Design a protein with these regions (language model features):
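N-terminal, well-ordered alpha-helical segments
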Residues: 19, 23, 48, 59-61, ...
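Generic alpha-helical scaffold signal
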Residues: 11, 15, 55-57, 68, ...
Length: 184
């Protein structure tokens, strides 16, 4: 299932989105499979949790079903149960032993805009110069990652596949393609 998350729903966290989709599956009468055992739960997994405050046009959710309607009927049934801010874009059956969305998604595209688009502090050329000085000219961008047990120095530049400055409505914004997986 591919879905969009926008508007006020950007403030809903990942665990609440999971509970929301569990209820939406029941309301839409999707014949979803349940795990076995003492406390059965719907078999579903999100490709990558989206941070609070971030909108998306392409989030992915895998579910296991016993039977299904056509893709268009399933999209309509789910969208009829959705609140404003969540929209099902597509629904399709995968082969029996297909990899999960979580294991396939390796990168994510981000567009980072200034909060007040009408009051941009930099011109496009100024921002391009700052990005060149910070990102392109630097051989590495080191940060210290702290865990409960240790500290580890990481090079963030290895996790950024593309970093551009673009312009929309007269205001520059950042376009980034970054790794979604873990890097040791």
């Amino acid at each position: 299932i591919k879905f969009r998350k926008y508007g006020v729903m950007k403030f809903i966290g990942h665990l609440d989105m999971m509970r929301y989709f569990q209820k939406a599956m029941r309301r839409a009468e999707i014949d979803i499979a349940y795990s076995e055992g003492f406390s059965p739960h719907q078999i579903m997994s999100f490709a990558a949790p989206l941070g609070v405050g971030i909108t998306s046009d392409g989030e992915y959710l895998d579910i296991e079903v016993h039977s299904t309607r056509s893709s268009s009927e399933s999209v309509k049934a789910l969208n009829d149960t959705m609140v404003e801010g969540v929209e099902i874009v597509s629904y399709r059956m995968l082969p029996e032993h297909a990899k999960t969305a979580m294991s396939i998604v390796a990168a994510a595209d981000y567009k980072v805009f200034y909060k007040d688009k009408g009051n941009c502090p930099f011109t496009l050329d100024e921002l391009k110069g700052k990005v060149k000085a910070f990102y392109e000219d630097a051989p590495e961008i080191l940060v210290t990652k702290k865990t409960k047990k240790s500290e580890k120095v990481m090079d963030l530049k290895q996790l950024v596949y593309d970093f551009q400055v673009e312009e929309a409505d007269g205001c520059p914004f950042f376009y980034l393609k970054v790794s979604t997986g873990s890097v040791d």
